[in-house]
Amino acid sequence: WVPGTRGNIDHIVIAPAGVFVVDAKAHKGRIEIRDRGGLFRTDYRLTVGGRDCSSLADGMGWQVQAVLTVLRDHGADPAPAVTPVLCFLEVEWPLFRAPDSFHGVLIESTRSLARVLTSTTVLTVAQADELAALLAERLPAK
């Protein structure tokens, strides 16, 4: 839980590739990014099974900000980047041009998320342990 709010963060992952805020979703249906705009404007929407799920990505900003605030206020200098991720568990992924991000939020499956978390190394084991302890203390599980 995030103190001072009614909201929670599903998962905070500290991995070799950095700090990630992961929101897991068990939606069903085909995942796509569609342009719902008209002839003279674009209006991209994240859809799952035809339903507009754009608000899921748009709502992750406060979660990232909450984690960044804890890191900055408690000595992480410089604070590592915090990457928002929507992890869809049961969606149908298109064979070609599967969405990789939407409004700055990574769009992943459980399999692809594992690759993202280990794709690069920006944190040492000691740094990851320190960040994990800090975040566990300041943003406790409920």
What is each of the regions a protein language model found here?
Residues 1-7, 15-19, 28-35, 39-142:
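Surface-exposed interaction regions that form or flank ligand-binding interfaces
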Residues 10:
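Phosphate-centric recognition/catalysis
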